[in-house]
């Protein structure tokens, strides 16, 4: 089983139900048709469990029973495609999810209501990854998570959602669409936290640490003392930078996530990165804490 499939199965197992998640799946994998009775909706996926999930979301929110169909593609290893087909209440569903404009080509981005709400943003990113997301196996040592969109506007909207959670998301246009991607291991782990894939995040971090340990084995024998010295030096440097920010622009002007880390660092200068991570109001990896401390240092350097 690929790591991408593991992540998607964990997300499906969360049992969450969100219209924002459904909106992302419909926008990225849905298509409209016209029949005598009105509009029809077809949502395609190569994952049977995702098809069932879509069926359950439609039933739960709109009390409609869709059809799950499948057909075979030729000359492909993964050649079964599932289609969730619906021919009732389609116009009402599109209107409720604010998708009608997007389907007719007027609006290609993401609903501003989703962009402005944390929980809706998390759910939308979860749906986007379920629909068109993939990531490299951390065993490869090459870290990349990407989500493919048809339109650049939508890819940029996904990047904005990720940046809302301090992820360094970028976009690129390719022949078959636009891609929103993350390349830093810390950002990928934080993304997994954002969408709720905690087990996958823990496995990713464990594999990453194991690889780093193997690669650094020759240096590890004499690293303990040096690491302690570096930790103390880094802690004092960060504290000095936090004081600098407090005396100039003020900590209250930092993003909430950075404010919390800054207060912890100043109040507990002896804390290790792991202790800082454990003390945060929301779970975060050691790498994620380091990522935020680097951002604080960068802000101070620019003052």
From Swiss-Prot:
Residues annotated to bind DNA: 272-303
Superkingdom of origin: Bacteria
Q: Which UniProt keywords apply?
A: Cell cycle, Cell division, DNA-binding
Query: What Pfam families does the record tag this protein with?
Result: HTH_WhiA, LAGLIDADG_WhiA, WhiA_N
From the Swiss-Prot or TrEMBL record, what is one GO molecular function term?
Answer: DNA binding
Q: Which GO terms describe its biological process?
A: cell division; regulation of sporulation
> Which family, according to UniProt?
Belongs to the WhiA family.
Give the matching PANTHER family: CELL DIVISION PROTEIN WHIA-RELATED (PTHR37307:SF1)
Q: What does this protein do?
A: Involved in cell division and chromosome segregation.
Q: What is this protein called?
A: Probable cell division protein WhiA
| Native organism | Streptococcus gordonii (strain Challis / ATCC 35105 / BCRC 15272 / CH1 / DL1 / V288)
Q: What gene does this protein come from? A: whiA
